[in-house]
Structure formats: C-alpha cells, structure tokens
Amino acid sequence: MTECFLPPASSPSEHRRAEHGGGLARTPSSEEISPTKFPGLYRTGEPLPPHDILHEPPDIVSEDEKDHGKKKGKFKKKEKRTEGYAAFQEDSSGDEAESPSKIKRSKGIHVFKKPSFSKKKEKDFKIKEKPKEEKHKEDKHKEKKSKDLTAADVVKQWKEKKKKKKPTPEPESLPVDIPRLRPVFGIPLIEAAERTMIYDGIRLPLVFRECIDFIEQHGMKCEGIYRVSGIKSKVDELKAAYDREESPNLEDYEPYTVASLLKQYLRELPENVLTKDLMPRFEEACGKTTEGERLQECQRLLKELPECNFCLTSWLVVHMDHVIEQELETKMNIQNISIVLSPTVQISNRVLYVFFTHVQELFGGVQIKRVIKPLRWSNMATMPALPETQETIKEEIRRQEFLLNCLHRELQAGVKDLSKEERLWEVQRILTALKRKLREAKRQDCETKIAQEIASLSKEDVSKEEMTENEEEVLNILLAQENEILTEQEELVAMEQYLRRQIATEKEEIDRLRAEISEIQSRQQHGRSETEEYSSESESESEDEEELQYILEDLQRQNEELEIKNTHLNQAIHEEREAIIELRVQLRLLQKQRVKSEQLQEEEELGKQNVPSQLPRDNLPETKAPKDQPKALMEQMKPSPIKKTGKKLSSETLI
C-alpha cells in the first residue's frame, strides 16, 4: 500500500531550491507535519500516520542540502524555545536521528502550551534555568579552591569544622528569685485582710480600702458611677498589680475603672459577705411587717457576723450612702445602686433597701478612714520629703515599723523575693532618717519652750525666788544639752579617726593592686609579642578566646551586681554606725546621771550623820560610844570601790 501526504506549505528556501532545480525532493518528516504545528490536520487522540520504510527515499543528500539542514535545525531550536511547543511522544524523523540531543531536550518538557508565547514568559523560563547554572559554577569554584589549598589550610578547615560540631557549653544562668504569685482576688476575706491589712488595725483588704478612698475623693461627681463599666484592659492591669502585692497609683486611672475593679473584687469573693448561715435569716428579718422588728432583728444579726464581714458590709453601705447623697451629680439613687450591687455581692434588693434606708440606725458609728501609704525612698540620690511635726513623724514611724515587721515575718517564713529584701533595706533607711528627724524636732521644741519662758519671764514681774527656780531649771536643761552635744562630738571624733585609718589602709591596698595590674599588663604585652612570632604554632591555643571573652563578660556583669550590693551595704553600715553613736551618747549621759545621783545620795548621808554631832551634849543620851565608832565613820566617808569600778567600766565602753 502506498501512503499519501498532503502537500505542506513550502518554506522560502525550498521554493528557491525548486526554482533552481538543485537536489532531490525529499518526503516531509513527522516533525514537520506534527499535530502541534498543524493543529487542524489530525483529530485529537488519533495516532500519527505511520511511516513505511519501503517508501522512504534513499539517504543521498547533497552538500547544499546538508548546509540547509544545519540552518534548518538551528531555526527549529529557536522556534522550539520561542514557541514553547512540547511533543506528546517521540518522533522518528531523519533529522532527529542525525541529532540525538534534540530528542533529549524534547523529553524533558511534558506540558502542552498555547502557540502564543510572550517575551515575559520566555524571560521567566530563562530565569528558572539560571540557578542550576550558578550551582554548577559554584561547584567548579569550590573544586578549584580545594585544588589550590595547602595542607595547613586543610588542617585549619578541619579544626574549624570540629569546633563548630563541638557542643558549646551553655552558660549557667544565675539563679533568679521569682516571686511567688499570691493573689488577693478570689481568696477568702479573712486571709486577704490579714495579708494586706495596714498599720491602723482595720481588718479590711487593702484593695477594698484604696478603691473606696479613691472614689470618695474623685468619683462623687461622675455620672453613673458603678453603673458605667471601666476599660477591661485597665481593670485587668490593676488586678494583676494587686495580685503581685504591689500598690499601684490609682491617680493614673479613671474612677469608672476603679469602680469596676471594686465590683470585680466583691464578685470574686468565694463566700457571701453575710455568710451562708445568716443570709436566709436576714431575708426573714427584712420580710417582717413592722419597721421596728426589722431593725431590731437586723441589728442582732449584724452583731453575729465575723469581724471582717461586718467591717466590709458597714464600709460598703456607708460608702454607697455617700454616693446616693450626691444623686444630683451621680444620677444614682437607691434603686440604681441596688440593681448594680445586688448581683455583685449576692444580696437581695429587699435586704439592701433596708440597709440603705436605715444607715444611721444600723451603721451609725462607722467612719471611712483615709488610707495613708507608707513613705517610699526608692531613689538613693534624692532625700524623700520627711514630715515636720512630732506627731506626723511618730505616725510615720508606726507605719514603717508595722511594714518592717510584716516584711521580716514574710522573709522568715521562707518567701524568697529580691524586691522584698530591697524594700526591707529601704524601710530601715527611712526609719533611721525619721528617728533622727524626731530627735531634731524634740530639740527644737525644747529650745522654743525655753525661749518662750525666758521671754515671758522678762516681761512679767515675778519675785526673785521664782526667777532663781526658773533659772535653775533652764540651766539644768542647757547643761544637759551641752553634755549631750559634747559626748556626741567625742564619739564623732573617734569615728572620724577610725574612718581615716580605714581610708589610709584602703589607699595602700589600692596602690598595691595597681602595681599588680601593671605587672600583669606588662606580662601580657610580653606574651603577645612572643605569640605574634610563633603565631603559626599557637593557632590551636587561640580557639578558646571566645569562651574566655564570654567568661570575662560574665565576670564583669557579676562585678557590677556586687558593686550595687556593696553600695547598699555601705549605706546600711553608715546608718547603723550613726545609730550606734546615738546609743553610746545616751549611755554616757545615763552613766553621768547615775554618778551624779550617787554623789547626791552620799552628800545626803553625810549631812544626816553630821546633824547629830552638832546637837548640844545635854540632849545626847548618856551612853558610851564604842571605841570603833570613829573608824566606822571614816569608812563611810571613803568612796565605795563599786563606784570606782563603775567609772572604769564607763571609760572602757567609750574606748
């Protein structure tokens, strides 16, 4: 059988060849009439027309056709790249047999694309092929480098790889004392009151008192207080601060936020404020017919409440009564307050109505006291503003001593917290400063009283006896002050001499350490010069430089922390020394007073003994005195050895 082919569209080169009559006519290959180039020639899914080997012309090609074939092959390559066609199966044309590289390239692409292939896609396709070429170039570059390497370089690379593979020991982190979270919200009322109670002894949690105090000052003119909710993120921030046992500054927040915080605290109480046992009895009492019976029963039940529960209930009702009194500005009456407060504290509206309408009868003696926070001294560079009068100083000392006892109790219980230890030192510093200020205030008050007395005495006409008595009192006070100042001056001079000796020894130690440092630096410079000469031999020893650098940085950081601790300790030692000087002055004054009192007693005893000797002989009884009586009198006249030893002991204590 013979096969028939449709005449393909002749190319310009074939047309010229036909005109000149050069070469033999050849049959078209399967590639030239493939369905990809002529999509309308064959149906989709039909196989290509078979090639019969018998009908193929002989492989006799002229030199012109060979040149033309090469040009055509190049043209086909460009055409494939630009058009982006892909063969569905292998072609068995004569051209592909001559150039097997074409078959390999056609196998790599198995995607049929549209005939229209833009330049942009062609660029993208070329960019995708670039990384392979770059990798090939890098591999060649590495091979060249590996050929050029010497033995020393290979050893160096091996050491670096080994060092990278070695697991570097992670630095041991310093133990950090993480403070335990001791929440205030959600715990029983008694526990919260005992933990956060302040110096005045009112058994209420600090968060409750501070919130009420802030709203009493800043929230009485806010419309819809306790009804309008605050910002939730701010409320959560305040709650977290109180759970960390901090005292945030409520001045930075709105009254609505603080009111929402108070409601949240009351809502999270694990037990009802009126207790589970008494709550139904309160309901029964408020449901009675007559008002007198209701009041009498409520008063009796309120006395049965625990101390913390009664205190919280009374403060809450009195505070809400203050809010109701400002109804014109707050827009909150009894009904609104009851609607807001009833689901929060889980008390019915009927009970709350009885409480709010009979505040004076049920909670008449309750007064809301302001919270005064203890003084802080966080910045060592500045001195805090201490109170001026003696009463305020004493009150602040009571606050600080109460806080100091609480901190000591918590630290002795095993709570490890660096912030509490720092607060302990801070409270001790404040206490020493307050006590010093109190002594100065007492001295100033005494001086002012003396000046006032002198002024009043100069103006008034008084007798000489009164003047002498007052002058004696004034002189005694002045002498006592003078003695105190002199003894204090002596102690300060002794302390100054001791500190000067210590400074001299410290300077000598500094000079010695500087000499050692200079010697070590000279050794290091000498060692560096030697290592530079033999650097090729000591490459292995320089591997640990990074570790040494890290150790040095760690030591420097530890040194900074120790310096901070040292400054705190020095400050505390200085304050303790001042306290010791004051105690020594007081001891010396007491010893002097004791010596004076003993001398006065001796003089009185001698005076009593001399009185009977001056009486007339007639009045004396006719009894013979013993022979040893003069000796006994002489022994009484002599100072006792106990007094001498007492004086010696006082001098030894001063030394």
UniProtKB/Swiss-Prot annotation:
Coiled coil: none annotated. ATP binds at G69, K70, K71, K72, G73, K74, A413, G414, V415, K416, D417, L418, S419, K420. GO terms for cellular component: cytosol; lamellipodium; membrane; mitochondrion; nucleus; plasma membrane; spindle pole. Residues 496-655 are annotated as: Mediates interaction with REPS1 and REPS2. It catalyses: an S-substituted glutathione(in) + ATP + H2O = an S-substituted glutathione(out) + ADP + phosphate + H(+); ATP + H2O + xenobioticSide 1 = ADP + phosphate + xenobioticSide 2; leukotriene C4(in) + ATP + H2O = leukotriene C4(out) + ADP + phosphate + H(+). Residues 1-153, 520-548, 600-655 are annotated as: Disordered. One of its GO terms (molecular function) is ABC-type glutathione S-conjugate transporter activity. SMART domains: RhoGAP. Residues 102-119 are annotated as: Nuclear localization signal. Residues 532-548 have a biased composition (Acidic residues). Residues 69-79, 102-118 have a biased composition (Basic residues). It holds the Pfam family RLIP76_Ral-bd. Residues 149-214 are annotated as: Mediates association with membranes and could form transmembrane domains. Gene3D superfamilies: 1.20.58.90, Rho GTPase activation protein. It is an enzyme of class 7 (translocase). The record marks R227 as: Arginine finger. It is a peripheral membrane protein. Residues 494-510 are annotated as: Required to maintain nuclear localization. Transmembrane segments: none annotated. Its EC number is 7.6.2.2, 7.6.2.3. Residues 133-142 are annotated as: 2 X 5 AA tandem repeats of E-[D/E]-K-H-K. Residues 187-383 form the Rho-GAP domain. The Rho-GAP domain mediates the GTPase activator activity toward CDC42. Multifunctional protein that functions as a downstream effector of ralA and ralB. As a GTPase-activating protein/GAP can inactivate CDC42 and RAC1 by stimulating their GTPase activity. As part of the Ral signaling pathway, may also regulate ligand-dependent EGF and insulin receptors-mediated endocytosis. During mitosis, may act as a scaffold protein in the phosphorylation of EPSIN/EPN1 by the mitotic kinase cyclin B-CDK1, preventing endocytosis during that phase of the cell cycle. During mitosis, also controls mitochondrial fission as an effector of ralA. Could also function as a primary ATP-dependent active transporter for glutathione conjugates of electrophiles. May also actively catalyze the efflux of a wide range of substrates including xenobiotics like doxorubicin (DOX) contributing to cell multidrug resistance. Interacts with the active, GTP-bound form of ralB and ralA. This is RalA-binding protein 1-A. The lineage of its organism: Eukaryota, Metazoa, Chordata, Craniata, Vertebrata. The gene is ralbp1-a.
